[in-house]
Design a protein with these regions (language model features):
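Periplasmic-binding protein-like
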Residues: 38, 115-123, 189, 193, ...
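Extended ligand-binding regions for polar small-molecule ligands
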Residues: 58-67, 127, 134, 149, ...
């Protein structure tokens, strides 16, 4: 997996796109810069056991690179500011499970949606008081979520800012629920299933769907690469490859936890660090 741009390779947003023998765009081996947080299960993370970058984003975009003759160059970026960085042209594309919204579409372009999702309420497995969003509205509860996300926006709009505790990373929000520092979280169902797989004895999803949205890849406005990725997504849907990758990462069988990923940072609250971290 490439981690940084070389000084000689041609950027994919500057190449002449031809058609390959498979009928898909051929990008001639160019480098395609891709922003990843590397801290958002199951989309992208660094496996602490072997130091290898893994996740849905990696599997999908690596396969696209094989289909359309480009080299993904994954560049770590903080979620807070990622969308603006894409809008400013710092990256050719961003993953990280970005929800397609009209507000975001004003400053960036989106690919076709690759997953339909719903927002759900997540609570500790032993919690019997909270069974729906109505319980959160009517009770004295604290809801943890990640700042800058549609989950945060929904929580504030439905519950009021005083009830919402915002974290820089979603894993902190989930750990707050597990530890009892927060009563619930508002989370995308796909990510929630991943957390349930990783913490089957600690968290659960309750209530029905709160919203219906789609996730898409984010690009600078006017990027010629949007159509390239859309064709790649369509090909992966037709071949069954996308469904195969979705089943791998978006189900309770996904068992990677935040204790299994390399994310030791002195800025992370000590109670949320993996046990073997020394910072």
């Amino acid at each position: 997996v490439a981690a940084a741009c070389s000084t000689t390779a041609v950027p994919c947003d500057e190449v002449e796109i031809t058609t390959g023998e498979n009928g898909l765009p051929d990008l001639g081996g160019c480098e395609f810069t891709f922003a990843v947080e590397n801290a958002y299960l199951p989309f992208n993370y660094i496996d602490a056991a072997d130091g290898v970058a893994k996740g849905w984003d990696y599997d999908v975009f690596n396969h696209m690179g094989e289909l359309m003759n480009f080299t993904p160059v994954y560049i770590p970026a903080a979620w807070d500011g990622m969308i603006q960085a894409v809008a400013d042209g710092q990256f050719m594309v961003a993953g990280d499970g970005i929800t397609i919204t009209a507000e975001r579409d004003e400053i960036i372009d989106f690919s076709d949606g690759y997953i339909n999702l719903a927002q759900r309420v997540l609570v500790a497995v032993g919690n019997t008081e909270i069974t729906s969003i109505d319980d959160l509205k009517n009770g004295d509860y604290t809801v943890a979520t990640q700042k800058g996300t549609t989950n945060y926006e929904f929580a504030v709009s439905e519950l009021g800012e005083d009830k919402v505790q915002a974290f820089d990373d979603f894993n902190f929000a989930i750990q707050a629920v597990i530890s009892g520092d927060a009563d619930a979280s508002i989370i995308d169902e796909t990510a929630g299933l991943g957390y349930m797989g990783a913490n089957k004895d600690q968290v659960k999803l309750v209530g029905g769907d709160l919203t219906s949205e789609q996730l898409g890849f984010a690009f600078p406005n006017g990027s010629p690469l949007v159509d390239v990725v859309n064709q790649g997504l369509a090909a992966m849907k037709d071949s069954g490859k996308l469904a195969e990758i979705n089943a791998k990462f978006f189900s309770p069988d996904f068992s990677v936890t935040y204790d299994d990923i390399a994310e030791c940072d002195e800025n992370i609250p000590e109670e949320y660090l993996p046990e073997d971290c020394e910072v």
